[in-house]
């Protein structure tokens, strides 16, 4: 049975509903039974408002189009919503996901030949624009277009930004000024599903302390601590944005403010507006006031180059330049100047009204010198009111700053002539303010020596390529090339920020290119691993034995202060939808037994997540640089891509760091030692020191468990000290649950009890390699690692699985297939019983049996007859089947006149009957019954478990 994880339940159900309306083409084989596995998706936090769907969390009243993965993709005609609980919209709690088909709600197009646009459900007429896309005449920003050329958003390969925009990605911008400050800031916000990712640049402002989002009335909706990553740049993410805030954002009523120490209520602020110019912006400028100080005056400019000529299109937004008393004029003349070192190069006149926040214009036919000054950041833009020459704002034009990361995965499938050698490449790039490009390229597994590394455009033909930079620095036998491309040019910088460039690696055997990758920007995710370390290259040549795969990938991995593993995996060249499910595993050195942790099973080429309960053995492998990240696919179930991971850490058992780690960087295979340098200390987080559990050394998680003198995070699993071999404990939200290991009967007459195992095993036949005096290397195919109880099993071993949080599953038996290393779990086949009242001999038995002496013999029959419960839970205690007891009700103690009994998993309680004469004279009159009578009283009062517990709470 395949060991691949199943898709999330909501996506699976939705896919079945969508496919169920299609006519069946024929009776096919029955679908295989899903393997027993532990729950991988995090449980919803108690009291949290929202919905969980497909591994993502959505706020109440939020709507989205479900993504079913390959080959279905995003279902644009299906709209899902997170509805509030039925018991009241004001009650906090998990919501309910409701999905419906919106295709019947599409309006009828008025034209004769409507078109179905990509990413839309309803058909629209050509040249039709919705009302939300119409802009005032003064703000109409025209994209550079030509009949023979595609627009920038459609040119080249689709990058990360375009893929994100196709999944609900929308850009907003805000000009931030203040009535009591000369500072000016610019905020760019991207809405990706239910998260806001923002990049904020500022001028003439002290270091901000917080980023504040509020409504038009000033009510604070969200605050984020400000930790500048570069000079004058702040990055952050607002996750799970509430529905009300999303409505304010789309209505352009959501405001952003920068809070400083001198202005705790906000020094500069402004509303977020949506504009289509953001999709093409590659250069920008922040305009501040010149001359005498005046507060609340400033502007920002969004610029882009034309696709067909050296013309600069721009949109300029300003505030405070026009006084309110000038509002009576219909048009106000403004003068725009382009300067270089104080020398006037160009001048434009623009007439705007006082009600419009800006205007759009074009600077045509830039000279070669002006293009060079543009990329160097030496062109200055100035704006002034012709009626008041003294009021003037200006700023230098430079390449757009962003918190996103420029990266590329190089693989053989994307080469000009596709090759399949198992090689891989990984690149990280940084564009400087002067137009220079810093590159760090890792290459592994090439068939021959690397002879050329180039940054180039998409070729029109195979022999017509425009090379922008010849990269150097890869020494013979080395894996990493680090250098600078000094002459990228304005056109090259523009194409780089538009995701239109490619990296090509040529070797002796493949001079035209053995590896090629698309350079794309990854949206900011909130973690610093991308900026602090190099990614880990993933190649088929690193798999043992090597796999000649045409795919490749790279991954960022890091450990935070809680020893939680953050990972992000990007792949390329997998071959599309026919590849099926892709899985990522973290494991130890190849050829040695040990844990194999499934990080994620996913569709497509990207995966990210957090692992909070990493095994101590894997943490030690990470610290020693012996851990591996393995990517498996349908075509290569034993591994298609692999990368070696090194994360220096001092994490201990249970997921807690007892001492501050000296370095947390990830060092990739073949990367220089500088990649493993310690990341910068984050302000506000004190250095960790040895401390008692719950002490001030680290913030305490309210869901952790304290057991045997140690703290365990939620979801952690471990062997307790009192029984390290035959017990397994789990932390489930401050509650420790320990289950004993129940051994199945061995399949041999003379089992052997190994000293390091709980259950007896059958002796294996002695192999030639096991003879004394011969070295033995353990083959990973000789055993299996079961993720349920995280233990290594010998080949041929059979056991009952432990699946947290459910505990021991005695109605299932798992078998280790030594040839493939797979774990096969199946249900126990219970025999069909001919007796009328079967019994369960032991409470932990799975199958029932006929009583001794009934004369009935078992028959082969229904599978999985073990539907009976293990016992009853009453007042926090477990009672086995058929057991009787007297309940205890605080503060009165044991209620001896009430008897409870566990039957069919439900406790039934009743008061003792005092009506029978037998009750009198037996001592019960003084203990239970108020009086004895020979007359029969009404039927005994029967109360269930909830009623008694309610009575106990009331008393």
Swiss-Prot record:
Location(s) in or outside the cell: Secreted
Pfam families: CHRD, VWC
Region Disordered: start-end pairs: 124-168, 675-703, 934-955
Biological processes per GO annotation: BMP signaling pathway; dorsal/ventral pattern formation; floor plate development; negative regulation of BMP signaling pathway; negative regulation of cell migration; negative regulation of osteoblast differentiation; positive regulation of cell adhesion; positive regulation of mesenchymal cell proliferation
Glycan attachment points: 217, 351, 365, 434
Biased composition (Polar residues): 125-138
GO molecular function, one term: cytokine binding
Domain (VWFC): residue spans on this chain: 49-126, 703-763, 784-850, 872-932
Tissues and organs where the protein is expressed, per its UniProt entry: Expressed at the highest level in liver.
GO cellular component: extracellular space
Signal sequence annotation: 1-26
Keywords from the named record: Developmental protein, Glycoprotein, Repeat, Secreted, Signal
PTM field: Cleaved by tolloid proteases; cleavage participates in dorsoventral patterning during early development.
Record function comment: Dorsalizing factor. Key developmental protein that dorsalizes early vertebrate embryonic tissues by binding to ventralizing TGF-beta family bone morphogenetic proteins (BMPs) and sequestering them in latent complexes.
Record family assignment: Belongs to the chordin family.
Protein's UniProt name: Chordin
Organism: Homo sapiens (Human)
């Amino acid at each position: 049975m395949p060991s691949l994880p199943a898709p999330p339940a909501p996506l699976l159900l939705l896919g079945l509903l969508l496919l169920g309306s299609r006519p069946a083409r024929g009776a096919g084989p029955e679908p295989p039974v899903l393997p027993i596995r532990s729950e991988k998706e995090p449980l919803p936090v108690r009291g949290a408002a929202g919905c969980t769907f497909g591994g993502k969390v959505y706020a109440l009243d939020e709507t989205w189009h479900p993504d079913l993965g390959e080959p279905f993709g995003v279902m644009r005609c299906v709209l899902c919503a997170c509805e509030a609980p039925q018991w009241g919209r004001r009650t906090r709690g998990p919501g309910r996901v409701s999905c419906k088909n919106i295709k019947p709600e599409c309006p009828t197009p008025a034209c004769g030949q409507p078109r179905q646009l990509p990413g839309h459900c309803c058909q629209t007429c050509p040249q039709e624009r919705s009302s939300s896309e119409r802009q005032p005449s003064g703000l109409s920003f025209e994209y550079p277009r030509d009949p023979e050329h595609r627009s920038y958003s459609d040119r080249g390969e689709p990058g990360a930004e375009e893929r994100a925009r196709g999944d609900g990605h929308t850009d907003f911008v805000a000009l931030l000024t203040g009535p009591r400050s000369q500072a000016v800031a610019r905020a760019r916000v991207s809405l990706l599903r239910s998260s806001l990712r923002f990049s904020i640049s500022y001028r003439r402002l002290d270091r901000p302390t917080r980023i504040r989002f509020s409504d038009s009335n000033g009510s604070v909706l969200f605050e984020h601590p400000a930790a500048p990553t570069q000079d004058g740049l702040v990055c952050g993410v607002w996750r799970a944005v509430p529905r009300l805030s999303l409505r304010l954002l789309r209505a352009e009523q959501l405001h952003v403010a920068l809070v400083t120490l001198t202005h705790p209520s906000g020094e500069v602020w402004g509303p977020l507006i949506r504009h289509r110019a953001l999709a093409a912006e590659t250069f920008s400028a922040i305009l501040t006031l010149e001359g005498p100080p005046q507060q609340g005056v400033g502007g920002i400019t969004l610029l882009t180059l034309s696709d067909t000529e050296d013309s600069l299109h721009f949109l300029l937004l300003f505030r405070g330049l026009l006084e309110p008393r000038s509002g009576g004029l219909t048009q106000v003349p403004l003068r725009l100047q382009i300067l270089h070192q104080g020398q006037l190069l160009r001048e434009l006149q623009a007439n705007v009204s006082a009600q419009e926040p800006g205007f759009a214009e074009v600077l045509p036919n830039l000279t070669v010198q002006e293009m060079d000054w543009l990329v160097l950041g030496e062109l200055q833009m100035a704006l002034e009111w012709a009626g008041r020459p003294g009021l003037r704002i200006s700023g230098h034009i430079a390449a757009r700053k962003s918190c996103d990361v420029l990266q590329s995965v190089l693989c053989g499938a994307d080469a000009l002539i596709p090759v399949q050698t198992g090689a891989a490449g990984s690149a990280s790039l940084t564009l400087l303010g002067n137009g220079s490009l810093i590159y760090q390229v890792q290459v592994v597994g090439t068939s021959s020596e690397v002879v050329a590394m180039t940054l180039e455009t998409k070729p029109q033909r195979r022999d017509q390529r425009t090379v922008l930079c010849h990269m150097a620095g890869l020494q013979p036998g080395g894996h990493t090339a680090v250098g600078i491309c000094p002459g990228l040019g304005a056109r090259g910088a523009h194409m780089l920020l538009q995701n239109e460039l490619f990296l090509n690696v040529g070797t002796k055997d493949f001079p035209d290119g053995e590896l090629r990758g698309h350079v794309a920007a990854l949206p900011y995710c909130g973690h610093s691993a991308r900026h602090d370390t190099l990614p880990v290259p993933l190649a088929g040549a690193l798999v043992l034995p090597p796999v000649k795969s045409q795919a490749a990938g790279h991954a960022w991995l890091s450990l935070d202060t809680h020893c939680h593993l953050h990972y992000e995996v990007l792949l390329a060249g997998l071959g599309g939808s026919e590849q099926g499910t892709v899985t990522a595993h973290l494991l130890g050195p190849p050829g040695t037994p040990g844990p194999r942790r499934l990080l994620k099973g996913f569709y497509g080429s990207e995966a990210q997540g957090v692992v909070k309960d990493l095994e101590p053995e894997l943490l030690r492998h990470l610290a020693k640089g012996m851990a591996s990240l393995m990517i498996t696919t349908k075509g290569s179930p034993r591994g298609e891509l692999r990368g070696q991971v090194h994360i220096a850490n001092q994490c201990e058992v249970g997921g807690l760091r007892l001492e501050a780690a000296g370095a947390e960087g990830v060092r990739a295979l073949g990367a220089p030692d500088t990649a493993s340098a310690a990341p910068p200390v984050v302000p506000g987080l004190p250095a960790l020191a040895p401390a008692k559990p719950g002490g001030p050394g680290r913030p305490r998680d309210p869901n952790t468990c304290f057991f045997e003198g140690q703290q365990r995070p939620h979801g952690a699993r471990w062997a307790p000290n009192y029984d390290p071999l035959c017990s397994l404990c789990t932390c489930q939200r401050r509650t420790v649950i320990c289950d004993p290991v129940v051994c199945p009967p061995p399949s041999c007459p003379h089992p052997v009890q190994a000293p390091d195992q709980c259950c007896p095993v059958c002796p294996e036949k002695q192999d030639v390699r096991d003879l004394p005096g011969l070295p033995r290397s353990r083959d990973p195919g000789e055993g299996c690692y079961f993720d349920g109880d995280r233990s290594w099993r010998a080949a041929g071993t059979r056991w009952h699985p432990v699946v947290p949080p459910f505990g021991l599953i005695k109605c299932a038996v798992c078998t280790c297939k030594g040839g493939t290393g797979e774990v096969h779990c199946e249900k126990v086949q219970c025999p069909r019983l001919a007796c009328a009242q079967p019994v369960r001999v032991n409470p932990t038995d799975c199958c029932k049996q006929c009583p001794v002496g009934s004369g009935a013999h078992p028959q082969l029959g229904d599978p999985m007859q073990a539907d009976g419960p293990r016992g009853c839970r009453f007042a926090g205690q477990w009672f086995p089947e058929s057991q009787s007891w007297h309940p205890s009700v605080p503060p009165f103690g044991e209620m001896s006149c009430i008897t409870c009994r566990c039957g069919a998993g439900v406790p039934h309680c009743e008061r003792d009957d005092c009506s029978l004469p037998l009750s009198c004279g037996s001592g019960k009159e003084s203990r239970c019954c108020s009086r004895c009578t020979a007359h029969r009283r009404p039927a005994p009062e029967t109360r269930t478990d909830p009623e008694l517990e309610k009575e106990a709470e009331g008393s």
